């Protein structure tokens, strides 16, 4: 059993993840066989979490071989089996030759675990499990046999599997219709850091950085711990970002392509969709995506959109005011920044520093800040004192006509208490001063929105901005103000 001292030590070494650590501890201390799946976006810190929470508790652990550098598909199964065999040798396997099939490999693992079984809890950890399942390898049937035929009959076994290919994890484990149906005893999804957790991370690393720049780092790196780990103390946000993404030897060289190849079997189709979604903040319909990318509208496109959504790169939502039709919107900040700026400017080692005050970067900040707000709805609701009110978020786009100007609202909070928060998001380096022209635009949006509401509903014009509002003659209609400090709660 993990002691209280051990748990406190683990929690102090990991930013956030309190619930996840407690859940892994509960599973470790149970008196029955446990089969837990841990999944989440690549680079989000799944492996680090597991290895810290269960430090020194592993009986056997193995990591699948990344497909990124395996060009020869015919040898992928052989490579995976060879790597698995070496892991077993490192853990004490003796008297067996390299297996030629996964059924043979798991039989050898069973023999090894029986040899190592002391009656205490045995933790068996497979990292990047989806990588092990190569085409025509019959891996899954052998893995099913390993759990159903061996692990499940031993009360001291805790099987932990981890994977970045979220769709594979969900389809083959969580929603399995085969031999693993209903076999998971728990599943844990690991999410990116919130802004508050990013701040805690930088403090832990003794990196001095303002909240304004933490928000900017979130706009680029999306709260992914692995990316933040490349920040260096003593450098500005601009300099750090240039070193991580730009120049001849950036720390995340070719990360976009490697990211997609590591997760998706149809990575080229996935990247086509991402590049399209970058071009319009509120997203595209399925039909528009098919038309623009040339991908057929059949089941293949539906499957690709589904795996992108399950992997948290895109989200599907119903635009406000539309009874039919769903939109797909990009929600991965890193992909947005990479496609917009890194791909075209990677050789410029000082791109961020050179363009920091340019109109190009200002336009990006506007879109990226809206993304950050979507990702921190909980914090915004808390600031608006509606944490207990059921609410959904949406966007609204109304094309203009010859008679009437259109409008676009990127963030609506539609509440069950008959109030709709129309959120204006402004990322500024100082307090926001509403001009006469901007007030007119805001009021136009409010009036158009009111036309769609019932008589019992009210619109609250809400400003989400960096450093608050300059109260003047054009700001009176704003009901609530949310600052970036509020996003850190």
For each feature predicted by the language model, list its residue ranges.
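Phosphate-binding site recognition
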Residues: 1-355, 461
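A cross-kingdom feature that marks ATP-driven nucleic-acid transaction machinery
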Residues: 320, 326-489
